[in-house]
Amino acid sequence: MRNIQIALTKGRLEKHVIPLFEQIGIDCSELKNKGRKLVFQSKNTDISFILVKAVDVATYVEHGVADIGVVGKDVLMENEKDIYEMLDLGVGVCKFCVASIPTYNPKSYRKKRIATKYPHITSNYFHDKGEDVEIIKIEGSVEIAPILGLVDAIVDIVETGKTLQENGLIVFEEMYSISARMIVNKAALKTKKDEIFSIINVMEQEILSGK
């Protein structure tokens, strides 16, 4: 078996994904005791892992540094990459939502200002609804933007809604459901087809058996 390099997202999604790889027999002990390391070799296999920021997973896969990647659907929607999206892993499930302070009127005809970390997704969503909005990109906590009057509403990923609630915001619209996706480099799918599909097929069966 030729070596397969898998790019994973650091943080919350990583904790959801590691158990899936363990369930299909891939050793992830180094990943679970990583310290500050970012590159790991799975014991007794030709599989290695790299840990990078979510937005970089698709970039590493697109350019062939990683053969396989696991990343949230939000990253793929916001950043168009030349990769294959192969499998919905069904973990890390969240929703894109429009949220604001209780006095926000989503049916108002005046042009709205929307704060978000995801301008591409937000622009497409409101364009499809036929609404003209001004989008302000915020890199930090977007929840404060409507509270301070910078914008009318925000678009953000909501998992439990606790952060919104703590800041006095409510969800006005649920836009899209998102989850972790397995992606593959296009060239690698030709040159390492058997190795890649051996992982994808077993992973898919594991997911289906767990439903």
From Swiss-Prot:
Its main location: cytoplasm. The keyword Amino-acid biosynthesis applies. Pfam families: HisG. It comes from the Bacteria. GO terms for cellular component: cytoplasm. It is an enzyme of class 2 (transferase). Its EC number is 2.4.2.17. It catalyses: 1-(5-phospho-beta-D-ribosyl)-ATP + diphosphate = 5-phospho-alpha-D-ribose 1-diphosphate + ATP. It is found in: Cytoplasm. Pathway: Amino-acid biosynthesis; L-histidine biosynthesis; L-histidine from 5-phospho-alpha-D-ribose 1-diphosphate: step 1/9. Keywords: Amino-acid biosynthesis, ATP-binding, Cytoplasm, Glycosyltransferase, Histidine biosynthesis, Nucleotide-binding, Transferase. Gene3D superfamilies: Periplasmic binding protein-like II. GO terms for biological process: L-histidine biosynthetic process. One of its GO terms (molecular function) is ATP binding. Belongs to the ATP phosphoribosyltransferase family. Short subfamily. Catalyzes the condensation of ATP and 5-phosphoribose 1-diphosphate to form N'-(5'-phosphoribosyl)-ATP (PR-ATP). Has a crucial role in the pathway because the rate of histidine biosynthesis seems to be controlled primarily by regulation of HisG enzymatic activity. Lacks the C-terminal regulatory region which is replaced by HisZ. HAMAP family: HisG_Short. This is ATP phosphoribosyltransferase. The gene is hisG.
